Amino acid sequence: MASRKDERAAKEERAQAAAELAAKELRDVNQDRERGIKVVEHKEEVSGGPGVIGSILKSVQGTLGQAKEVVVGKAHDTAEVSRENTDYAYDKGREGGDVAAQKAEEAKEKAKMAKDTTMGKAGEYKDYTAQKAEEAKEKAAQKAEETKEKAGEYKNYTAQKAGEAKDTTLGKAGEYKDYAAQKAAEAKDTTAQKAAEAKEKTGEYKDYAAQKAAEAKVLAAQKAAEAKDTTGKDGEYKDYAAQKAAEAKDATMQKTGEYKDYAAQKTAETKDATMEKAKEYKEYAAQKAAEAKDATMQKTGEYKDYSAQKAAETKDATMEKTKEYKDYTAQKAAETKDATMEKAKEAKDTTVQKTGEYKDYAAEKAKEGKDVTVEKAKEGKDTTVGKMTELKDSAADAARKAMDMFLGKKEEVKGKAGETAEAAKEKYEDTEFAARKKMEELKLQEEGVKDEAKQRAEADRETAGDRGSAAKGTIFGAMGSVKDAIVGKLTMPSDVVKDKQQQEAVIKVDETRPGAVAEALKAADQMHGQAFNDVGKMGDEEVIVERKETRQGKM
């Protein structure tokens, strides 16, 4: 738990550091945006020379030079400014592209870290799940083993109880059997005793009858003797004695029969009672044995059912635990998968958002550079047109003044005009040659700038392609925008290029009669004491600057 908190704190610190770095870079970019581009213009002053003619010539030469500067120099300045703006826009675009690539790389690194963290978490959860599953499996096996042991114990206990019940039943049956035998023996002994007693009673009755018969016989003899003594009484006593003897005999026989019947009846009753008791004890013993057997079977069934119930409960508990761990494993796997997908989605959204921000930033910078370039080009164009107009007016005024002076002093300046015209022609040719040379240099410089920009754009495109492949193609748009902005800055808008290419300066002096300028220059030189060789007519005194059109290739 502590390691997870430390890891979370480290992630928060890294995220805060990245946010501070991004805020600092944004602040620097805003400061650079507020600074803008400063353009310094230098003005050159032309010092005048001695003399009116020299001043006029220098004025004319200055006018021609300024006209050349309008055609060549201002275009060069505009090209320099455009190139500086292009370089600035290119540098800013490249910086924006580098920043965007760096941010994309950081976002990629963060996404990779998030992915690694998520995979680590998934591995931990997977290991934890596997560990829990293994523990559940071991626990289930342990439960099964315990259940098996319990079942064995219950089985042994059931067998023991069954054995004990069987032994108890056999013991009870033996006891009941012994009890029945004992009771039968006791009944037999009782019957024998009763029979002996009855026999004894019969003997006693028999002895009693014999005794009574003897007594009666004695009494009869006595009576007979008495009767014999009494003559009259002899017959009566004899009858009486016979009668009494018969009565005693009948009574004895009756008593003997009664005792015999009683003894037989008692013997039969005792025998019946003994048999009935034996039968009852036998049935009781069988009933007890059956009850003991039923109780034993019931106990065995109960223990068997209890063992089966315990085994089923243990199995159900094991299955439930296994199912719970399985559900827990599936839930953890689903949560880990959802967390992984969420982290990947957040990293992807962050990367796309950062790429969009850097793309917008690069596009904004390119647009600002383009606007600055267009504005500078427009200002240069307006300045060039204004300068051309001023120079044209100034040249026309100077030409008019010169013509006026020349017309007033025709004879004085006639000889000097040829030399001055020749010098002006040579100066014009030199200026034209220098202008052409400058145009060629500018053309070569523009081609070099184009080639350099093309190489830079190609290298940046390759770098952007590599970085864009690593960032899943999201940087191509930003680098493409920067590239388009750079190309736009290099090539400039078509209307601006057309205006730049088609700028021309034509200084036209009012036509005069042939020799008028030469005469005026000669007269002026003679007036100031300067001599020169007359070279003749110079033709039409008209200065025309050729228009140079160049084509710029597209990158």
Curated annotation (Swiss-Prot):
Residue ranges for the region (17 X approximate tandem repeats) are: 97-391
Stretches the record annotates as Disordered: 83-118, 132-151, 184-204, 444-472
Cell compartment(s), UniProt:
Cytoplasm; Secreted, Cell wall
Q: Main localisation, per the record?
A: cytoplasm
Q: Which GO terms describe its biological process?
A: cold acclimation
Q: Name one GO cellular component term.
A: extracellular region
Superkingdom: Eukaryota
Keyword Cytoplasm included in the entry's annotation: yes
- Which Pfam family, an example, fits this chain? LEA_4
Question: What keyword terms does UniProt attach to this protein?
Answer: Cell wall, Cytoplasm, Repeat, Secreted
Q: Spans of the sequence repeats?
A: 97-114, 115-125, 126-140, 141-154, 155-176, 177-191, 192-205, 206-216, 217-237, 238-259, 260-281, 282-303, 304-325, 326-343, 344-358, 359-376, 377-391
Recorded hits in InterPro entries, A to Z, give:
ECP63-like_dom (IPR004238)
Q: Where is the composition biased (Basic and acidic residues)?
A: 83-115, 444-465
Tell me, in a sentence or two, what this protein's role is.
May play a role in late embryogeny.
| Family label | Belongs to the LEA type 4 family.
Q: What is this protein called?
A: Embryonic protein DC-8
Q: Which organism is it from?
A: Daucus carota (Wild carrot)
